[in-house]
Amino acid sequence: MKFNLPLVATFILFIISSLFFSSCQSEEDSFIPKPYGYFRIELPEQSYQKLEGDFPYSFEHSKYAKVVKNTSQNAENYWITLKYEPTSVAEIHITYKEVKNDPKLFMEYVNDAHKITFNEINTARSSAIDQVIDSKNGNGIVFTISEGEVPTVFNYWVSDSSTHFLRAAMYVPTSSQNDSLAPILKYTKDDMMHMLETFEWRN
């Protein structure tokens, strides 16, 4: 019988190495790796209140989310952020545009909203699940990014196609894996769906 000498030598080296390391470690100081754990955040029972203020739109939002004016450099009128307290793990960004009875302007807003989502999908090599909105207040699309680490995992836009255009997006300003934040993401997504279900244009 012929043996493959390189293979035999490799096997013997593996056995010797295993015996050497096991002899150097006692039972007390041997290291057993522990699985990574995810931090846990207690979430309150969901409760809602009507949006206050002079906005061209209305909805019910979480009582635990503070409404803050968007003060970024490119912010426009009626742009707001819903910040959850005290965790502030997830935020909901609301942007608003006037359509001005301009079909080209409407399509520009739609394309911009889709472009933002698809750019994040391509960056994270993720996929999106979309749902069409068809209600008395207009039409739109809901996007859920199914996997990958992206800052926006859930967003939607809604418009009456002639006067108003609104986009709502959940942002997660953290580098943690989205899997570890699953309960918070679901909680915030449910809040956003409630916002959509109670959504109305004011004028």
Question: Can you name each region flagged by the protein language model?
Answer:
Residues 111-167:
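Signature of long, low-cysteine stretches enriched in small and polar/charged residues
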Residues 96-98:
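Short beta-strand-to-loop capping motifs
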Residues 93:
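His/Glu-rich zincin catalytic helix
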Residues 14-19, 146:
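Intrinsically disordered, low-complexity coil segments
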Residues 2-6, 19-90, 101-107, 123-132, ...:
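N-terminal targeting sequences that direct proteins away from the cytosol to non-cytosolic compartments
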Residues 6-14:
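Sec-dependent N-terminal signal peptides
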